[in-house]
Amino acid sequence: MINTIAFLNNNNSEVTAYNVTDLRTGEILSSKIGVPRDLAVSVRRNGVYQMAEIDPRFRTYYIADEVICENLTARMLKAFGLSLGLATNLAGSAAYSPEELRSPEFTQKYGITASVMDNVLYNYLAQPGDKEKGVVLIVDKPGVCDAFTLKYLYAATSENESDTLKKWAMEHDGDPRYFYGKRSPAYATDPRCQNYDLGNDPIASLDAQIAHVKYVVKNSPAWFHDDNIPNDYRELFPDFVIIELINKTLSPVSSYIGGIYINEANEKSNVPSYQPVSADMQKKVLQKIFSTFYDLSWLDSNKDFLRLGGVNPDMSTWIYNNGYPMMSLMFRLMRMGLSVEKSTRPYTQEAYLNDIEKQLFKETLNGKPLSAPMIAQLSVYISSLKGMCPTLKAIDKAVSTRVTSIALNEQTNHKLQSLGLLTTFASISATEKQSGMEPMTSVNFYSGTDI
C-alpha cells in the first residue's frame, strides 16, 4: 500500500487524514492525507477575526498565497502527526503562559503550542507590534510533547522496553507541556482540553480575543469595497463575529466554572487524579464573563459593519435575546457536581447561583432600573431554574394559565425585592415570544398565590 497526499475537489475547508492499519497488530500500513480545494475559505473566515489586528495580511478578502501556505503548513503538521500514529492532544495549547506566547525568543524556539496535535492554529494572544518583534503567529513546528511522543513510539531501547518507557514518562510527571489532553466527558470538563483555547490564563485569553474582534468590527468595512468580492461573504461576515464570540470566546473560558483537572491514575505519580479548578478562579471567570458581555454596544457602534449583513439595527440584542451568555453559564451549573465533590473548598452550586444573582441585580441594588441586556439574562436564568427544578416544573404545569406578567422597564416603579427568592418561584413563560431584534422588556414570574 502507498501513502498519498491528494488534492480534494470538494467544498470541505479542512485538511483530512486517516490511516489504514492492520487490525491484528495496529501497524500503520498506509496514510491518506487530503488537501481541500477551499482551504482559503477557512483561512479567510477564521484567520481574520483572530489575526487582523496583529497581521495586516489578513485585512483583505484576497488572502496572499504566503498566508495560505503558512496555514497549510500548520495543518499538515497535524496531518503528518496523525499519519505517524499520534492522537489529537487538546492540552497542547494550554501549556504556555501569555508572557511566553508574546516572547519572540520563546515562540521561535518552542512554537505556540506544546503539541501540534491540538486544534489551535493562531497565536491570538499576540498584540499589535508583536509580529514586528518576531513573535511567531501561527503553528510552525512540532512541539516538545510531539517530540517526546515520537521518541516514546519509535526510539529503540536496549533495556527492558516497558520499564524504559515508564521511566521516560515519569521524567516529565507534572510538567504541563507533556500532559496529554483527551476530550472531556460531559460530567467532568477539563478546561485544559478545549477547542480554540490558547495559554494557561483564561482571563488574558478572553481579553485578547475580544480586543481582536473589536478591531474587526471597527475596521473591516474598509476591507471589502471591491465589487468583485462575493456578496455572500460580505453578508455573512457579521454572523461569523457572533460565532467567534460564542464558540471560540465564551465556550472555552466558561469551562473553568465547575471545571476539574483530570490526570490518569499512576501509582508513582505525584499529580492527583482529580484536581478541581479553584473556587477563586471560578469566581473570577464568572465575573469576567459578566463584565465582558454586559455591554456589547461596541458590536453596534459601526453602522457600516452592521450593513455588511443587510439591514441590521444591531447585533447585541440578537445575542442577548438568544440567551447569551446566561445560557452558557446555566449549562455549567449542571456540570459542577464532580468539581464540588472532589474539592476541599468547593465553589458550590448555591454559591454560584448567589453570585449570578448579585450580577443580575447589581443595577437594582444601586437604585437603577434593569437594563434590556439584564432583563434578557434574567429571563434565561429564570427559565433555566424552572427547567432544572422538579417543584417549579410541577407548579408551571398546575398554573400555566395563571402566570402573571410584570413589565420591567424604566417607566415601572417596581421593587424586585417583592419577588422574593427568584430561585424559589420564578419562571419564564414557555410561550412568550420576542419579536425580531427588539430588546426584551418584560419577564414572567410566579406570584405568591401561585405557590
What are these regions (language model features)?
Residues 1-83, 87, 111-112, 122-125, ...:
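Metzincin-family zinc-dependent endopeptidase catalytic domain
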Residues 92-451:
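Conserved catalytic/binding loops enriched for acidic/polar residues
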